[in-house]
């Protein structure tokens, strides 16, 4: 028996189909393409059928691709949207998730584990790969804005992650926000890289 092989890579154009397999396997044009934080709300609304996929493809061609895909034995199983906070319009304009200081952090805004692969260790590899991507790009720290649920969360809001998940990945609470997810307050958690 061979040991499991885990890899995480930025979602460059050549890995776009793997990203889509995780986040939107059926390729539904109006389904989530992880754009709501990356584009202005009016831009997202104006995108017609098929345009959301194209908008995400364009983001994958930028200097900082918009996230990472984790593979288990060659199969894409996880997605993490991460990038410099300064390049994420919804965060730069947010009155609910304000910067805690002037450190030019990278921000985790979405974590998705593909159906059929949850509770198999994907998240640990995914977050470690996301942090490595940020560190390799010169980020001094990575932030996330999870919740601290008393039990299991509704899957539709679980993309923000949980305090426990980020603590296991070496993050610590550095502040609070005025934002909520699934009715729960969101925290500011950080992992320093320098």
Residue spans for each PLM region:
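Conserved N-terminal entry element of GNAT/NAT acetyltransferase domains
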Residues: 1-38
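Active-site rim helix/loop that mediates acceptor-substrate recognition in acyltransferases
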Residues: 33-67
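Short beta-strand micro-motifs in enzyme catalytic cores
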Residues: 66-68, 104, 183-189
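C-terminal "cap" of GNAT-fold acetyltransferases
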Residues: 157-164, 168-169, 175-194
